[in-house]
Amino acid sequence: LRCLNCPEVFCRNFHTCRNGEKICFKRFDQRKLLGKRYTRGCAVTCPVAKPREIVECCSTDGCNR
């Protein structure tokens, strides 16, 4: 599995996930509309969202755009 791994809105950096990591995720703070920064990467399970945070998970190459 290959997931995007950079904080910019238009990310092109791919990271090859380790064995056992079968989820790509993207998380961001829903309050910050301008200058939005993302945390993207691989995970074993979908991360739990903190208050006012949005977490999106998927399981195909490059799906965490």
UniProtKB/Swiss-Prot annotation:
Record keywords, A-Z: Disulfide bond, Secreted, Toxin
Main localization (coarse): secreted
Single GO molecular function: toxin activity
Pfam families, sorted: Toxin_cobra-type
The organism's place on the tree of life at top rank: Eukaryota
CDD domains according to UniProt: TFP_snake_toxin
Expressing tissues: Expressed by the venom gland.
CC annotations in GO: extracellular region
Function in brief: Binds with low affinity to muscular (alpha-1-beta-1-delta-epsilon/CHRNA1-CHRNB1-CHRND-CHRNE) and very low affinity to neuronal (alpha-7/CHRNA7) nicotinic acetylcholine receptor (nAChR).
Protein name: Weak toxin CM-10
Species, as recorded: Naja nivea
Lineage, highest ranks first: Eukaryota, Metazoa, Chordata, Craniata, Vertebrata
